[in-house]
From Swiss-Prot:
Cellular component, GO annotation: extracellular region
The keyword Secreted is annotated on this UniProt entry: yes
Keyword Cytoplasm annotated: no
Localization of this protein: Secreted
Biased composition, class Basic and acidic residues, residue ranges: 53-66
Name assigned to this protein: U-scoloptoxin(24)-Er2a
Family: Belongs to the scoloptoxin-24 family.
UniProt note on tissues of expression: Expressed by the venom gland.
GO molecular function: toxin activity
Length: 66
């Protein structure tokens, strides 16, 4: 018997895959801009981008203070 919780998890995963697929096209430069607009803020893509930007900013701040 399928439990309601399993059903809900399946639906959420399915929607997440559909949403992630919206940003991918053959044109790489256009797809990157579209991904940032269409992906939810909680996705790994945004988390990693934010982390990279903060590291780059910290590095540039260190360079300026030298």
């Amino acid at each position: 018997m399928v439990k309601p919780l399993h059903c809900l998890i399946g639906i959420v995963l399915f929607l997440a895959v559909l949403n992630a697929g919206n940003g991918f096209t053959l044109d790489r430069s256009a797809s990157i801009e579209r991904q940032e607009d269409s992906w939810p803020k909680i996705s790994l893509f945004h988390g990693n981008q934010r982390k990279k930007r903060s590291e780059e900013k910290r590095f540039s701040d260190m360079e300026q203070t030298k």
